[in-house]
Amino acid sequence: MLAFFLPVFLLSLMIGLPVFFGLLAAPGILLWLNEQPRDLALLYRNVYNGMDSFPLMAIPFFMLAGVLMNRGGITTRLVEFSQAIMGHFRGGLAHVNILSSMLFAGLSGSAVADTSAIGSMLIPAMVKNGYTRKFSAAITAASSVIGPIIPPSGIMIIYSYVMGESVAALFLAGIIPGVLVGLGLMLMTWVMAQRYDFPVATKRSTWSERGNASMKAFFPLMTPVIILGGILGGVFTPTEASAVAVAYSLVISLFVLKSMVIRDLPKVLTEAAMTSSVVLLLVGAAMAFKTVVSLSHTPEILAEWILTLSENPLILLFLINLLLFLVGMFLDAGPAIIILAPILGPIFINLGVHPVHFAIIMSVNLTVGLATPPMGLVLFVASSVSGERIESISKAILPFLAIEVVVIFMITYIPAVSLAIPRYFGFIIGG
């Protein structure tokens, strides 16, 4: 069965079918060939059932909050804050780009939204200040992968939905890995800045200027604090937190900062609806794909095959990192998690890997795949925003991908990187 599903799915992608149809093509064709029209109808019913979930409501709400923040000029305030903190370093705008992505991650949780919002502001500014266009696009794409790692994160919500893990535990587990990716990118930027004599963006800001920038960014920076604080304090669930984030974003954009007016709302709602509908359709299709694959006993066959490769968990973790990294190049993280997590998760949990630890290994690998040549999605977004050819961006991003791979191995072989914070807050007991 696996020999049928995989080639049909890959062929559908190669001929240009959207991923949604590709995920339905293989099981649909199989059921049609077997003359099982009732099961074929059940397949498409599973698409609806896959989206009909209360926890998944958090995804469109968080996306709407991110769009509200972006349309409300919040991105500009975050960039100004980052520039006041780091603009005076050599290679300052590259550092500003990375720090802005880390801050924006707490608002949107999306790599594509990060690339579009931060890139449209900083890539032209970086080019104007003497950076090459390909480098500017590459650092934007590389830093955008922080978005789905630092909470709130759409892919963590999907993982929780599929595997039954605590969303709060997954959110907390992503904090240190996300910060490590950001610090690693800053280190590589510093090395390159010394070698290639990158320009300094601004003179050192005074404490007064930093204070002013901090005040302007105060309300946006409070968004992740409110979300995580409310969840950890038991005030609301992660799904309710997403609705609170929308209400908070709406109030500060319309009434506090007054950076939006009521007539902007239809455009904001339309943009958020279109973005979230794409994600939810992929989730529904992936759930239908997973259902048919499970009926064919493919997961059990694949699990047995993986265990024949080695009995050493460290070697298996290395191999699974490689697999997930490759999958992330071609398939969006959400559908990949829905399809692969139920197959791979139990294998490694039985080998002694903590469920939350494996969730972060999987999520970070698939997220970094978004920025990996030749098919990484954010490379196409960065190319569109910057006007630079994908081939040039792909070459320029390689040093940053090397850093992100190092962080992946740190996460994999040092469990405390992902487990320390959720254990501290009591979401993980023992193990």
Language model regions located:
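Alpha-helical transmembrane segments of multi-pass membrane transport proteins
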Residues: M1-G431
